[in-house]
Design a protein with these regions (language model features):
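Secretory targeting signatures
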Residues: 1-27
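Short, 15-30-residue, compositionally biased linear elements
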Residues: 2-3, 39, 164-168
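Short hydrophobic "helix-edge" motifs at membrane interfaces and signal-peptide entry regions
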Residues: 6, 21, 95, 172-174
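Processing junctions and N-termini across compartments
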Residues: 9-12, 34, 53, 69, ...
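Catalytic cores of phosphodiester-bond hydrolases, prominently lipid phosphodiesterases
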Residues: 128-417
């Protein structure tokens, strides 16, 4: 009788639901999500499958199957659960705009553009320096300019004694030369007015006077250079420019040089550097309309701060050696602590003048490239200028193109241009 009573009580409890055996379970995996809305009712680790690919959101790296992983979308401020919400990537460089330092892909950082009133969201509102936007970020002393020694002394322009080049300024410019060594004299010992400034080579005390056997009109030459600098900007689809450097071996009063630069329109574009300060970026020089740097081979004059003493603001290697193996990388003249320097790369003939034959050897692409890298390594400083005679022989401009693509002397050498 007692057994029957116990059985009866159990049956009553079962049907009343008190023992829970017949109670329906609406959350089988006990993950807090009802089975009716749980995409994985028997997996306590998963409950959602936004893209319906059979992989739960917790395990799925791309919940909405839009091609962008969830972590990336979260960083890029797009919705990882909405297939129509994807990271913005204006320049399609696979870096979303939120994380991209160069949103429009023009090679210039966003902050750099904003600080210079350029639009970081418009790749047509940009700046190109020496053909590439990235060079705008280089400081003046962290770029290598091809340089012509005695640039005015060209057979094409009627110079027949002491020739240094076959072709004149126009061809040099078209060939990529952007730094020029020139010598300023008065046309004669008697004609010494500001209007009498010429480009000639030799000692002013020599007989005959150095301008007596060849002279180049300095006013016409600099006016052409000014025009070439202006016209290079006119051919660009966007803002662009190039920085030009003059190194003057001077034999006239400073006020006569001032007259020369004023008359040729060059004064307005000259940059004045304060000794001891960092050199500015090439881009800033161009944007500020100060795309001409002038050095002269004599002591500075406070009345003419734009005439930088090249021996104070920089230095130069030796020059005019007799043999290639005599060429050195070390300081010959000037202040070796300065970052701006000239790597001179020309030989003198047995007559003491430029050698048109052996210029082929020392201007050869691989010879000059290897020498430039060797000197860069030895001095732990990129050459600012590589200067040659007979620039037409060899590949001076191709060498500097290659060098400027290198961040460091130990960088991989890019292919021949």
């Amino acid at each position: 009788m007692k057994t029957l009573s116990t059985l009866f009580i159990v049956i009553i409890l079962l049907f009343s639901g008190c023992l829970g055996i017949f109670e329906e379970d609406f959350d089988d995996d006990d993950d807090g999500f009802l089975d009716t809305i749980d995409a994985f009712p028997n997996d306590s680790n998963e409950w959602l499958d936004t893209d319906g690919d059979g992989i739960g959101n917790n395990a799925d790296k791309d919940d909405d199957d839009d091609g962008f992983e969830d972590a990336l979308e979260s960083s890029c401020l797009s919705d990882p659960l909405n297939i129509s919400s994807i990271p913005l990537d204006m320049d399609q460089d696979d870096i979303c705009d939120v994380l991209d330092d160069d949103i429009d892909g023009d090679g210039l950082p966003n902050d750099w553009e904003i600080n210079r009133s350029l639009d970081p969201l418009d790749n047509s509102d940009t700046l190109s320096c020496h053909g590439y936007s990235v060079y705008c970020l280089r400081s003046y002393d962290d770029f290598t300019f091809p340089e012509s020694h005695n640039a005015y002394s060209a057979l094409e322009d009627g110079v027949f004694m002491g020739v240094n080049h076959l072709t004149g300024l126009q061809a040099q410019w078209d060939g990529g030369i952007r730094a020029f060594m020139v010598d300023t004299h008065h046309v004669s010992s008697e004609d010494t007015s500001p209007e009498d400034v010429r480009f000639c080579h030799g000692s002013p005390n020599a007989f005959p006077h150095p301008c007596s056997y060849s002279e180049i009109d300095a006013f016409g030459w600099l006016s052409l250079l000014n025009s070439l600098m202006n016209s290079s900007k006119d051919t660009c689809l966007t803002l662009c420019g190039e920085v030009v450097t003059l190194l003057i071996e001077n034999y006239v009063p400073a006020e006569h040089l001032e007259y020369l630069f004023n008359k040729t329109g060059m004064s307005d574009r000259i940059y004045i550097h304060n000794f001891g300060e960092d050199w500015p970026d090439i881009g800033d020089l161009i944007l500020n309309g100060q795309d001409l740097v002038v050095f002269w081979e004599q002591t500075g004059d406070d009345k003419y701060p734009w005439l930088h003493d090249f021996g104070e603001f920089g230095w130069t290697t030796n020059y005019g050696e007799s043999e290639p193996d005599e060429m050195k990388c070390t300081v010959f003249r000037g202040n070796g602590s300065q970052p701006v320097w000239h790597l001179n790369n020309w030989l003198s003939s047995i007559y003491g003048v430029a050698d048109p034959i052996r210029s082929n050897e020392v201007n050869d692409y691989y010879f000059l490239l290897n020498r430039t890298i060797e000197c860069w390594e030895m001095m732990d400083n990129r050459p600012t200028f590589v200067a040659v005679d007979y620039w037409e022989n060899g590949e001076i401009t191709n060498v500097t193109i290659t060098i400027n693509k290198m961040e460091h002397w130990s960088s991989d050498i890019p292919p021949h241009p």
